Amino acid sequence: MAKGLIGKKVGMSQIFDEQGNIIPVTVLEVGPCAVSQVKSVENDGYEAIQLAFQDTKEFQISKAEKNHLAKASLGPKKVLREFRSFGDSPATGSVLKVQDIFAVSDVVKVTGVSKGRGFQGVVKRHGHAGGPGGHGSRFHRHPGSMGANSTPSRVFKGVKLPGRTGSQQTTVRNLKVVRINEEKNLVFVSGAVPGTTNTVITIEKI
């Protein structure tokens, strides 16, 4: 069985627990996911399950993807992801739903692409304190010294400088499943998840 599923981010909300405390949650629409391929040690060198998510139109996928999905008797799918398997593997072409993998109180990790922020300076990108705020200072939000002099006469790789921020694959771990809506395939996890509304995510048990 796979240890995770594919889904998309719906948005954030809040719910109340039995003690009346507010819990901020992220709502995820998870699955149903079809099994497009089952990998084995004999054929592939490792065990894994490839899942397909979200129907799409035929012209939006390549011919190779179309033939690959046809082997599992599946129509065009927008997203393919692979998960390491454990225990008995489901049959190719079968469908996995939320209740097959997750339960309330499970601890999970969620992977998605973070929001893109464009080109940002060191204060926003790396959290630098910046310089004095007074009028006499000519140094407010600049990077400052980069730590190189006549030897070695260059800036080392990896120095925290301005640049393109966000829009990177990010994983948030140790999120707790607070609630599950099986009818609408919704999973409510505590805390925040990378990305914007409709960002494709993967959710896995830890």
From Swiss-Prot:
Domain of life of the source: Bacteria
Pfam family, one: Ribosomal_L3
Keywords: Ribonucleoprotein, Ribosomal protein, RNA-binding, rRNA-binding
BP-aspect Gene Ontology terms: translation
GO CC field: cytosolic large ribosomal subunit
Stretch list, region Disordered: 122-154
Listed InterPro entries: Ribosomal_uL3, Ribosomal_uL3_bac/org-type, Transl_B-barrel_sf
Quaternary structure and interacting proteins, as annotated: Part of the 50S ribosomal subunit. Forms a cluster with proteins L14 and L19.
UniProt xrefs under PANTHER family: 50S RIBOSOMAL PROTEIN L3, LARGE RIBOSOMAL SUBUNIT PROTEIN UL3C
Family according to the record: Belongs to the universal ribosomal protein uL3 family.
Family annotation (HAMAP family): Ribosomal_uL3_B (MF_01325_B)
Record's function text: One of the primary rRNA binding proteins, it binds directly near the 3'-end of the 23S rRNA, where it nucleates assembly of the 50S subunit.
Name of the protein in question: Large ribosomal subunit protein uL3
Naturally occurring in which organism (per UniProt): Leptospira borgpetersenii serovar Hardjo-bovis (strain JB197)
Protein's gene: rplC
